[in-house]
Structure formats: C-alpha cells, structure tokens
Amino acid sequence: MILSGKQIKDSLGKDIVIEPFNEKQINPNSYNLKLHNELLVYDEEVLDMKKPNKTKKLIIPEEGIVLEPRKLYLGRTLEYTETDKYVPMLEGRSSIGRLGVFIHVTAGFGDVGFKGYWTLEIFCVEPIRIYSGVEICQIYYHDVGGDYEKYSSGKYQNNKGIQPSLLYKDFIN
Amino acid sequence: MILSGKQIKDSLGKDIVIEPFNEKQINPNSYNLKLHNELLVYDEEVLDMKKPNKTKKLIIPEEGIVLEPRKLYLGRTLEYTETDKYVPMLEGRSSIGRLGVFIHVTAGFGDVGFKGYWTLEIFCVEPIRIYSGVEICQIYYHDVGGDYEKYSSGKYQNNKGIQPSLLYKDFIN
Amino acid sequence: MILSGKQIKDSLGKDIVIEPFNEKQINPNSYNLKLHNELLVYDEEVLDMKKPNKTKKLIIPEEGIVLEPRKLYLGRTLEYTETDKYVPMLEGRSSIGRLGVFIHVTAGFGDVGFKGYWTLEIFCVEPIRIYSGVEICQIYYHDVGGDYEKYSSGKYQNNKGIQPSLLYKDFIN
C-alpha cells in the first residue's frame, strides 16, 4: 500500500518528518522535494570500489549550472526527512525525466528508520542547465509488513549533507 | 500490495482502462505495453530547465531505427490508460533492459487518477535498432492507502500523445 | 506492503529461497545480494532487437576489473532465489549508486514464481574498478493481491547463469 498525499500530511510529526514542509508540494500519492545548491563531483580518473574516492564541491549559482553527460553529480534534497513505520522511497518527477535527468542510479529504495537528507545521484543524457530550488524528485511511502529493526547503519544515518559512497568500508571489516 | 495479472483483468472497465487490451500481454503481476511509432528528440545544444526546449519528430519505419547512446528519445505507449483506486507504475521488461535500453529516466512512478498515454524516456547504453509495436514496458498497480485526491495537473493529464517536459511552467508561477 | 528483514528470514524455506543465505546481509526491509565473477558483454557494432546478439564472456579477476562508461555488462547474482506468494524486486544499494553504477536498466521488477539467478544489467557513468563478491544490490518483496498465475515463461525461468536478451523470440511467434 502506498500512502496517499493526504495520509502523508496526516502522518507528519508522528511517523513522518519532512522539514521544511509546504502543502503545495503534496501530490496524489507522494510529496515533491527540492534540490539544494551544493553538488559533489568525483576527482578521480578511475573510481575504485575499495577506496575513498576524492571529491570536489560545486555550488549551483543563481543563473544555474550546465551538467555534462559523462559526469556523476552528487546532490542532495533541501529537505531533512525521518521515517518510521513506512518504507520511504525516492523517484524522479516525470518533468525531470523528460529532460533526461536521472536523480538516482538504481538506488531510490530507502529503509524504515532512516533519518537525514537524501543524497541524489544526478546524471544527464544530454547537456542541461539546472537550477537549485527546483522540485527535482518525489518521496513516497510503502507500508512495511510485520515487526522490523529500524535502519541504523553507521554510514548514512543522521547525515548533515551530501555523502559520497562509503562502500570501501565494506571491504575493511 | 501489487495487483496480480488476474486482478488487472478483473478491474478492466471499472478502476482500470487499457485500450487496446490483449490477454496475451498479461503477466503474473503486470501487463505489457507496446511502443508507438512516433518519437520526439530535442533540438538544442544545451537543454534548459527554465525554457520550452525545441523538439523534432521522428517516425520509426517498418525496418526499425537505430538509437544512438548520447541521445534522449521521447516515445509513447500505443495504449491509452486510465487508473482510479490504484497507483499505476511503469517499468521496463528484462528482455529490453538486457539490451541496455532504458524506458524511463527515474520517472516510472505514476499517480492515481492519471488518464492518457505514457511518455517514455528512451536512452540506450550501446547503439541499437528498435522496432515500433514491440512490447517495450509493463504497467503494474499498487493499492493506495486512505482517501486521496486524484491526479489533475494541467501538464500531462488527458494527453493525446508524446509530451516533452513542461518543467519550465514551474518557474513561471 | 514490503516485507521487513525479519519477515524475509521467517519466510525462508517456505515462500522464499535465497541460497546461499547469510544473516549479515539482512536489512530493515530487504536483503543484500552479491556479484558473481562472470560477466557477458555484447560483441556487436549495433545491437538489434530482432536478432540473437553475439556475446563474449569475461571473468572478474581477484584484483577487480575496470568498467568503461559506454558499455553494457551483463552480470549475475551469486545467490539463487525462488519466490512464491510475493513479488520479488531488485534495486541497487545506495553505496553502489553513489559511485554511478547502475545494476539494472529499468528492469528491477520481478514476477511471483520466478526461480533462478538474477541477471544484472551493469552500466557505469564514470570508469570504475569493481570486484566480484561485493554486495551489489538488494532484493525486496511486495505482497501480491488476489489469486495469480506463477511466472513460467520459457525465457528466463530456472536459468543456470547470466542470460543475454531473448527478445528476438518475441518476433518469431
């Protein structure tokens, strides 16, 4: 079962936190989230799963920034979210997808109990000028069956902003 | 809860409309949709979220058309659909994905109440010859929790064919 | 409704088979699957939906392999799975997506009744060195509504390993 927009609103302050929240961003069965003006790009010739890959920070200026196709841009949602009792999921908006802009790289699936900003994996098919503050994606919620253990991984929980991959930690222990 | 193929069939003419409909396209828990022969491509050096980007129309001929990797092709489903009471979602088929052809750009998430053809955001990893009429994707349905307001956005509701992004309208009001 | 990690564990040997299974790979509402060391790449200038496209096999060596951006790599899960009563779905992990590595090409949607290894459609935004055995994706489960007919397609059921696209068969009958 996917929560309706009305149910998302009714759950605020109980099982769901979205801050800041704006009624205009409610959809029939989801809620739109905005793009923050910070981006991270990797600074490596070849990335490596086993290493903490170097990154550089970019700020999206008022007049926007042009994204290049063969580059991954890590962004984040303006909104901070917390979710209990439901599985939060992120997907792009069709208006964004129709411009060939991916907002995640097969990684829109969340965990019940996750707290923080959502890091976005942005990739474009054709060069495109984007702007911070745009409603770039939507969050939606599934009910979860049976009892569960909340998300508590040391990697991305309670994050304060964009986080590059911490996959290399899997190879250490 | 995802509707089974049988339930999709039982809901036809009530909460679900798929036209044309063919029993052979029913799967265990989804229904296959076909590719129309029209495509739109953008006609811009650099796309811009704040502008109505120019497009050109292509027709897929009988012998098929070769898609190029660094190009976004907007297509559409042959079928017209309407959905009430459930959240409709679109995903590719594994036979299509195994050829490296994306059918949406993180935008397979629908809205309860949506009426129209589905615009497909087609992008290929390697050059590939595709054909119109192929069963290119599948529609599936989730139940929605609680009462809801049906999709009624002025952008894509009751569309008559492929629609490029109308994101620029977000920046006007 | 999405199964919690605990429910996935409780369903093992009944409606869900995951072999091999390791408790450490359970998440709040999914289970992580590992990457086998075999890859297939297509050996064609231009792929064609109507033809059985030629492929070449690669083995990921101990020191890993560098993936190139404009290439599709078909891999597979180490684990064999069977699912009844639920719809199995595959999605990447955020640690993998944050490195720009797709693990499916809009094809993460499964069928109730599917038995076999999952073929992965791997595509990277930037060049990256990957390693076999890494926890590359996660499987999660939705309940299915009403009675259903289990997946029994001749194409990918009971597979023994990576399978390239068999789409051309759709054009034969």
Swiss-Prot record, chains A, B, C:
Disulfide bonds: none annotated. Pathway: Pyrimidine metabolism; dUMP biosynthesis; dUMP from dCTP: step 1/1. The record marks 108-109 as: Important for bifunctional activity. It comes from the Bacteria. Belongs to the dCTP deaminase family. NCBIfam families: dCTP_deam (TIGR02274). Bifunctional enzyme that catalyzes both the deamination of dCTP to dUTP and the hydrolysis of dUTP to dUMP without releasing the toxic dUTP intermediate. This is dCTP deaminase, dUMP-forming. The lineage of its organism: Bacteria, Bacillati, Bacillota, Clostridia, Eubacteriales. The gene is dcd.
